[in-house]
A protein has these predicted regions:
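N-terminal secretory signal peptides that target proteins for export/translocation
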Residues: 1-17
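Post-cleavage N-terminal segment of exported redox proteins
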Residues: 8, 18-75, 112-177, 203, ...
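N-terminal, post-signal-peptide region of Sec/Tat-exported proteins
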Residues: 65-96
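Long compositionally biased, domain-poor regions of proteins
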Residues: 81, 193, 212, 241, ...
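Short coil/turn and helix-start
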Residues: 88-89, 188, 249
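The canonical Cys-X-X-Cys-His
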Residues: 91-101, 151, 179, 191-201, ...
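Short Cys/His-rich "knuckle" micro-motifs
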Residues: 104-107, 204-207
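Short cysteine/histidine-rich metal-coordination sites, predominantly Zn2+-binding motifs
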Residues: 109-118, 210-219
């Protein structure tokens, strides 16, 4: 199309000329975006960080603000029941080890966390399944299952309002940097990076919807688009598919490293779990 001459253009039929014109407009728009885009993503200053909550409509904010109106609370209620349910060969419940759920206050704010038994960081859902296999002698809950999301949401609710505070030390630093590399790396057929949207262009819109800063402050959360609760890994997979990139398998180290970086990137921001998003 870039070599289409005026004479060739005029010889096209009306419908074909219209199509060709649209393609030219798309190409020119794409070129202007590329030229306007900063070459290197810049980290958002702490004073300018904004939760996805601040980009939502008043109606959606009201849904998150009122537990009685939030559909996410259906999962939290299930999680409360699961917290007290005995399971596995050990016939133990979460409460048998941890007593009241309030003992989990601050846990979500600290995850993903380094697990010395495997020498890698793990996220909260993986920690729940480790407890099931090691303490309850039960089978792991399927990733993205209602039960696992419910437990993660119930545990996460105990940290609501607390500042995110993942560890940044000699054990986690290399994994945080690995997550940063994924965040800033161009991927997929669209040759986009996470940072281009969420660091450089968060004041803009995409298909009429606000581009947020991408802070992972409320997972697992209820997404109106999904009509269900979902994990941060599910959201990351959606983004990769949108970039026309190959998504990783659930629980892949790349996802956990990216989760860790995103929580480090949101350090100091309050936990919103279980959040609601459009």
């Amino acid at each position: 199309m870039s070599k289409l001459r005026c004479a060739d253009f005029l010889r096209l039929g009306t419908n074909n000329r219209t199509f060709a014109a649209l393609i030219l407009v798309v190409l020119m728009s794409a070129a202007s975006i590329v030229l306007a885009r900063p070459a290197i993503a810049s980290e958002i200053p702490a004073a300018e960080r904004k939760s996805g909550y601040e980009f939502m409509s008043g109606e959606t904010r009201a849904m998150q603000d009122d537990d009685a109106a939030s559909p996410a609370m259906l999962w939290v209620l299930d999680g409360k029941a699961l917290w007290n349910r005995k399971d596995g060969e050990a016939n133990k419940s979460c409460a048998d080890c941890h007593n009241e759920a309030s003992s989990m206050k601050g846990a979500t704010a600290r995850y993903p966390a380094f697990d010395k038994s495997i020498g890698l960081p793990i996220d909260l859902e993986q920690r729940i399944n480790l407890c099931r296999t090691e303490q309850q002698k039960a089978t792991p809950l399927p990733f993205e299952s209602r039960e696992l999301l419910a437990l993660a949401a119930f545990i996460g609710q105990q940290s609501r309002g607390m500042p995110i505070s993942v560890r940044d030390d000699e054990k986690t630093r290399s994994f945080i940097e690995a997550g940063r590399t994924i965040f800033e790396r161009r991927q997929g057929q669209l040759n986009l990076s996470c940072a281009q949207c969420h660091d450089d262009n968060w004041r803009g819109k995409l298909a009429g919807a606000p581009i947020t800063q991408g802070h992972a402050t409320g997972y697992p959360l209820y997404r109106l688009e999904w009509q269900a609760m979902g994990s941060l890994q599910r959201r990351l997979r959606n983004c990769l598919v949108g970039m026309r990139a190959e998504p990783y398998a659930f629980n892949a180290p790349e996802y956990v490293n990216l989760e860790l970086f995103l929580m480090w990137r949101a350090r100091g921001m309050p936990v919103e779990t279980p959040a609601v998003r459009p």
